[in-house]
């Protein structure tokens, strides 16, 4: 009987030892006492996986545009560059052709990082201002101004009402805030429907009017009301026939062409 219990004791002891060894292997290394030790460091690690927000939208950003050339005379600081072909900047539309259900966290917000003044919209347009840089040294050599056109159209269907209008955005949280006029007076509702596909040709392809005729007045829209269904699209760009006005900090000099570049950062978030 003694030998039986002694065997069970040693078996348990062996199992405990194996469990400790397995635990040490899983954690990467076992702690140890170090005679006359001087300390060390405790390493912490893991993995942070981005939480990809699923929305009903898809976004298109314009391609780089080259060949924006013009003649400039020595001593001249300002030159106009003709835009012979529309320059698309940003398009936002629904992924599906059927209206989606409203919910929190999916209303598009647009940030052009100070390049446009959304309070100065008139007839679906405002001024775009960018720093002009030396293409080789990336040093600022002037600024660029152009007429920036943009707009959005949305539809909404609720239990007791429906709407289909051009969009303005007064405050953060309104649909397309940062990319359209803050006030309804800056929106030309009669012209916006033709303007948007001129800026981004296929931007309206997935729009669902939900059987509602477009009204004359512009309105704000959010896409957060549960129980409502929505569809919308947005486009921005510089229209063909406009000019880019480049204003140099110093007059042109010498015979070497001035190679320039300008960048317009665009950020779309959802709230």
PLM segments and residue spans:
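Extreme N-terminal export signal peptides that direct proteins to the secretory pathway
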Residues: 1-165, 248-261, 271
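Generic alpha-helical secondary structure signal
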Residues: 116, 211, 234-238
């Amino acid at each position: 009987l003694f030998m039986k219990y002694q065997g069970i004791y040693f078996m348990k002891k062996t199992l405990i030892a194996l469990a400790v060894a397995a635990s040490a292997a899983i954690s990467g290394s076992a702690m140890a006492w170090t005679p006359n030790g001087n300390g060390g460091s405790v390493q912490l690690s893991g993995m942070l996986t981005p939480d990809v927000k699923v929305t009903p939208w898809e976004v298109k950003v314009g391609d780089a545009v080259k060949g924006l050339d013009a003649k400039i005379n020595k001593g001249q600081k300002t030159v106009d560059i003709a835009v012979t072909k529309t320059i698309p900047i940003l398009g936002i539309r629904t992924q599906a052709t059927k209206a989606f259900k409203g919910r929190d966290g999916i209303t598009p917000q647009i940030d052009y990082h100070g390049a446009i003044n959304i309070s100065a919209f008139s007839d679906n347009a405002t001024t775009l201002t960018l720093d002009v840089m030396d293409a080789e040294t990336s040093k600022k050599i002037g600024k660029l101004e152009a007429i920036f056109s943009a707009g959005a159209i949305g539809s909404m269907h609720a239990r007791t009402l429906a709407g289909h209008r051009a969009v303005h955005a007064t405050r953060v949280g309104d649909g397309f805030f940062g990319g359209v006029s803050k006030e309804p007076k800056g929106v030309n509702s009669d012209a916006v429907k033709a303007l948007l596909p001129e800026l981004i040709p296929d931007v309206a392809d997935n729009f669902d009017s939900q059987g509602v005729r477009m009204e004359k007045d512009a309105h704000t829209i959010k896409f957060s009301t549960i129980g409502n269904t929505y569809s919308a699209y947005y486009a921005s760009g510089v229209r063909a026939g406009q000019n880019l006005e480049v204003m140099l900090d110093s007059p042109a000099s010498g015979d070497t062409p001035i190679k320039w570049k300008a960048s317009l950062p665009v950020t779309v978030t959802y709230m």
